[in-house]
Each structure stands twice: as structure tokens, then as C-alpha cells.
A protein has these predicted regions:
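Lipid interaction determinants
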Residues: 1-63, 73-246
Length: 246
């Protein structure tokens, strides 16, 4: 099923745990994901999040999107120990578009459910502060999925755009009242996060980049699988997933 998660903290190796980003991950029912990590402001002069004006690219720690491949956990079969994990669930995330690289890289981690809708993730990936692959621990908090006003069902969808010759790849995903997007046009990177407002419709939480994802692409809230549309900037998008549930 679809889910929304925000990061509570990350811990690298023996360093203390901390969090210097506003990180939100949308994962759709079909296991497409969009992961956007925005540096928190370090001075009163820097805009906070949500921001009504676009932020500089320097505020983007990481923005990537692709598909997740989870393997379920294996629990003990011994009587009285059925809740003990013998082998944790494991997820591999394949990056189809990434602000850091044009390669389809992967990262992976072991997941351990915790109380209060939290999950601990253990794995290894590149530390942005050192440039080296290091072991990490991340604490994720699952957010409750909400409905857009007037909709009777929960909804998720995914739009993609690609132009190999122009170096274009982009993903827009909606889960409930959140939409996130990552767009690469050559060397230009754009990311966006929007949230539904009952009075004003889809409103920006954060937008970064020269080639901003046009909000007009998702002016309609429902898409049909295979549906094609052209944005105001000429990019051609196609719906690769559309799902609703009660």
C-alpha cells in the first residue's frame, strides 16, 4: 500500500544522531517513490519551510525518484516467539532520476518496525559530508494519509517525462494530500513539494530549480493509466500509475 514517511534523524557510523534536513518520501501503491531532502535554514536570513518563494539550489541536499523493491521480513515460527524477527525486511531503491547523478544507482537498507509508527533503517550509502560510503541508521516516521476535500477515496498517481536526446527525466507522484516531483533537464535540476489546501488548492511547500515543475501539470487531481498530457513548457508527461482505495 502507499505510504508517506518523514525522517526523524540520521546517524553516520559512530557520530551522534541528528537531522539537518526536511525530508519527505512518498511511496505509491505501485512502489514508485519520490524522496526530497531540503536543508533546514542555518540562519534567520534563510527562508523556512514551507516557503512561498523558490529556494536556491544550495538548499537541496538530495532529490531522487524511482522504484522500490521490498522483501518482507521473516518472523520466528517458534511458539511464543512469533513477533521476533529472524530476517528483517529489506528494500532496494533504484534511482531513475537523481540530482547527484545521471546513472541509475541503487541504495538499500534493512527495516525494523518500532512503536509509534516509526521504522529504523540500517544500511550503507555515500555520506554527503565526506563523499565516502558509510554505514548509517535512519529513523523514519509514517504519516497518516489524508484525502483531498471532496474525494471519497484515497488516491495516488505517478507521472513521468523522458526525452533521452535532451537529457530530460522527471517524476511527479501524488499520495493523498502531498505531491512531490524531481525533474532533470540536462544539468538543470528542479524539485517540488506541494500540499493540498482546502481553500487554495495545491500550494507549494518548497520549489527549487531553474526548470520548475509546472503546477499546471496536476491541475486535475485524477489521472488514467496511460494518459498523456503536455505541460506549458512543452514537456510530455504520461501517467504510469493511478490507484485509489477506501
Amino acid at each position: 500500500m502507499a505510504h508517506i514517511s518523514t525522517r526523524k534523524f540520521i546517524k553516520w557510523g559512530d557520530e551522534p544522531a541528528g537531522e539537518n534536513t526536511d525530508t519527505l518520501v512518498l511511496t505509491t501503491a505501485g512502489k514508485h517513490f519520490v524522496d526530497i531532502r531540503i536543508y533546514l535554514p542555518t540562519s534567520p536570513d534563510e527562508p523556512s519551510i514551507p516557503s512561498l518563494t523558490p529556494l536556491p539550489i544550495s538548499r537541496l541536499e538530495w532529490g531522487f525518484a524511482g522504484t522500490a523493491s521490498p522483501t518482507p521480513a521473516v518472523y520466528s515460527s517458534l511458539p511464543g516467539r512469533e513477533t521476533e524477527i529472524e530476517k528483517p525486511s529489506h528494500t532496494v531503491w533504484t534511482h531513475w532520476v537523481d540530482n547527484k547523478t545521471t546513472d541509475e544507482v541503487q541504495d538499500e537498507g534493512d527495516m525494523y518496525p518500532q512503536p509509534n509508527r516509526e521504522t529504523m533503517e540500517y544500511g550503507a550509502m555515500e555520506n554527503p559530508d565526506t563523499g565516502k560510503v558509510e554505514k548509517y541508521q535512519e529513523c523514519w516516521v509514517d504519516l497518516e494519509i489524508a484525502k483531498v476535500d471532496g474525494e471519497e477515496e484515497f488516491r495516488s498517481w505517478v507521472l513521468r517525462t523522458e526525452d533521452e536526446e535532451a537529457g530530460v527525466r522527471g517524476v511527479l507522484a501524488r499520495v493523498g494530500v502531498f505531491i512531490q516531483g524531481v525533474l532533470r533537464r540536462g544539468e538543470d535540476i528542479s524539485v517540488g513539494r506541494w500540499m493540498w489546501d482546502a481553500e487554495r488548492g495545491w500550494q507549494p511547500v518548497v520549489e527549487i530549480g531553474k526548470a520548475l515543475v509546472p503546477r499546471g501539470v496536476f491541475s486535475q487531481e485524477e489521472f488514467v493509466l496511460g494518459q498523456r498530457l503536455v505541460a506549458s513548457d512543452g514537456l510530455k508527461w504520461v501517467c504510469v500509475e493511478s490507484f485509489s482505495w477506501k
